[in-house]
Amino acid sequence: MYSAFNAGVNAFTRSLAVELGRDGVRVNAIAPDLADTLQTPADAMLRGRDPGMVRHWLPLGRFGQPDDYADVVVFLASDLSRFVTGVVVPVDGGTTAASGWYLRTDGRGWTNLPDQP
């Protein structure tokens, strides 16, 4: 269900951008990932794992903060993005770029097993 919803948001964003572009309306979306918030606290996401592992799981080494997402929204709503429409911006600390690969705990390369050195 989650994947279907995401695909729907992506398609809807592109479709609206095409439909409304001629009227000067830009339509974009963000795709947030792991965020340390009151609704999804880091402790709950860690589920008892060592907090130091976060630097291995996420290329930027930390969970997102609300301001990380808000700043992208402000950019998309500003004239700085006046030629940007129909895109979904991943705000994910690099998890999309890593595609499921994690820095090994010994620092010697990458693994697809996040808890293994």
Give a label for each model feature.
Residues 22, 34-58, 98-117:
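A glycine/serine/threonine-rich, flexible loop-to-helix segment
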Residues 1:
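Rossmann-fold NAD(P)H-dependent dehydrogenase/reductase core
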Residues 18-22, 82:
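Alpha-helical segment proximal to the catalytic Tyr-Lys
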